[in-house]
UniProtKB/Swiss-Prot annotation:
Record flagged with keyword Disulfide bond: yes
Subcellular location: Secreted
Keywords in alphabetical order: Amphibian defense peptide, Antibiotic, Antimicrobial, Disulfide bond, Secreted
Lineage: Eukaryota, Metazoa, Chordata, Craniata, Vertebrata
Protein name: Brevinin-1Sa
The protein's role, per its UniProt record: Antibacterial activity against Gram-negative bacterium E.coli.
Tissue spec: Expressed by the skin glands.
Pfam family, one: Antimicrobial_1
Organism encoding this protein: Lithobates sphenocephalus (Southern leopard frog)
S-S bonds: 18-24
Amino acid sequence: FLPAIVGAAGQFLPKIFCAISKKC
């Protein structure tokens, strides 16, 4: 359960951070 959340966050969070910070 937890590894799945960590894996999804690992893929999703960088994209959000990239969009917010405009550093891609």
